[in-house]
């Protein structure tokens, strides 16, 4: 009887650990607990790009910008899915929302499964790549310095 109870307790402990492992960080990702790793990594790459004065996009969007804390990344509205994972749902980097920010570089939003809108008009972004975003129904990338723009497999 003791052995059966021990096995049951061990199994219960395994099931309690499993969701934590699924939400945990991979060694190569710095994504905080719960955030979808590839979304975090791709947005972080954009936030860390610097303009000619050496100012990061993240700092342009928020004076409280902390690369390790997505809640400080201006212009992104997060969605907590029933699974517990945190996705980017709305991204607004346009000059209408953040005047005189002049964001630069490339923005890759491929595989953002919960993304519904992107607004990044009026900046100096040179490339935007969006694919496999089935919920995306609003997109405004006007008045940028785009040399590369691609959209595929979106709503």
Predicted regions and their residues:
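Residues on the solvent-exposed faces and adjacent turns
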Residues: 95, 122, 132, 143, ...
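Consensus positions within tandem repeat domains that build extended binding/scaffold surfaces
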Residues: 119, 138-140
